Structure formats: structure tokens, C-alpha cells
């Protein structure tokens, strides 16, 4: 028997985190309008003649100092973390506007 039935709308990081943390003795109903979980976070695959390139979008920044609760959660899930450089650039209007 469950303590409660809980509805969660959206499967972005907040919805997935809420579902995981509340799932103990509760029955969770996760509602997502899209055809996949993850909200804005997604891995895009760009196939080239040589090899595919994988570009992650949506997950803008992660550092242990500013996100201690998130850090603890991914460690509890045994998710590996790796060091990376953070960069951002934009090219629009055929190169008329570029930043980065």
C-alpha cells in the first residue's frame, strides 16, 4: 500500500528529481507532454562523413560549489562526473551576428 498518490507535471530535472525523491512509499504519476523524458536536456547527434558528434543541450552549468544538493544526488545515483571547459557561442543570420 502506498502512503500517497502524487502527480508530477514535467520530466525535466526538477520533475525527475521530485519523482525520485518522493518515490519511497508513494505512487508517482509523471506527466510529460513530449515524447521523451529530460525537458530541455537532450543529446543531439550530428552525423558527418568521418564520425558522429554528440552535443548535449539544456544542461547549461554544473559545479559542486553552487549545486551541492544536485552533486549529492548524482553521486547517490552513481553518475560519474568529468571535468570540462565551459564555452558558448552563437552564429545567426548567416554569420551577420556572432558572439562567443
Identify the residue ranges that each predicted region occupies:
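Short, flexible micro-motifs
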Residues: 13-18, 41-42
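A generic local structural motif
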Residues: 15-16, 47-49
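A short, Lys/Arg-enriched amphipathic alpha-helix followed by its capping loop at the start of a domain
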Residues: 6, 17-28, 76
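Dinucleotide-binding Rossmann-like beta1-alpha1 core, especially the glycine-rich loop
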Residues: 49-100
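Beta1/beta-strand and adjacent pyrophosphate-binding region of the FAD-binding site
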Residues: 1-14, 29
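Hydrophobic pocket-lining residues within nucleotide cofactor-binding pockets
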Residues: 13, 36-37, 62
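Glycine-rich FAD pyrophosphate-binding loop
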Residues: 9, 23-48
